[in-house]
Amino acid sequence: GLLKAALNLHKFGINKLVVIGGDGSLSGADELRDKWPQLQQELLETKQITQQEADFCKNLLLVVMVGSIDNDMAETEMTIGADTALHRITESIDDLRSTAYSHQRTFIVEVMGRNCGYLALMSAIATGASVVFIPEAPARKEWRENLCTLLDAGRNAGRRDNIVIVAEGAKDTEGNPVTAADIKDAIQSGL
């Protein structure tokens, strides 16, 4: 892991890194930076690098940028990748809507984002989705009945399509996951 990364950086004379990623990438880069002196010493002692290579790479300099479609990093307005992900989601939902409309269907779209409902909420607003489930607003205990009532009322009012968006980390107020399969089962049994 880290020792091999340090070896490769020394062998290629790389002492500056730009890391763009999410929690795992940024944590890994921070750990590499923290352990750099010990890794370098081990590489010297085992004669895997020369003193000249060690001197050139004495300090490891990092520039880190948050790149995460989840848009869940504090102190950033928008993470690299979130806007592109939102754009792709809204395009995909727009493509689904014509089929949903022409066949009078309900489509359930599960959106990535782990425990952050940003993509689900923003895509629901952008596409005029019927319902959205997000982790930040847990669904009430009676969400299944409420969902069916809402969708039925829309059909009775002449709505030909329904789009239900669920964030992958959505839960109910008791902490139970709310998944696309759960929503499908609720609609099939309740309508």
Which residues does each PLM region occupy?
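Glycine-rich nucleotide/cofactor/substrate-binding loop typically near the N-terminus or early
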Residues: 1-12, 16, 55
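Accessory alpha-helical/coil subdomains and C-terminal extensions
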Residues: 8, 19-21, 27-61, 79-191
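Beta-hairpin (beta-strand-turn-beta-strand) motif
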Residues: 22-23, 67
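Alpha-helix N-cap/helix-start and coil->helix boundary motif
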Residues: 25-26, 70
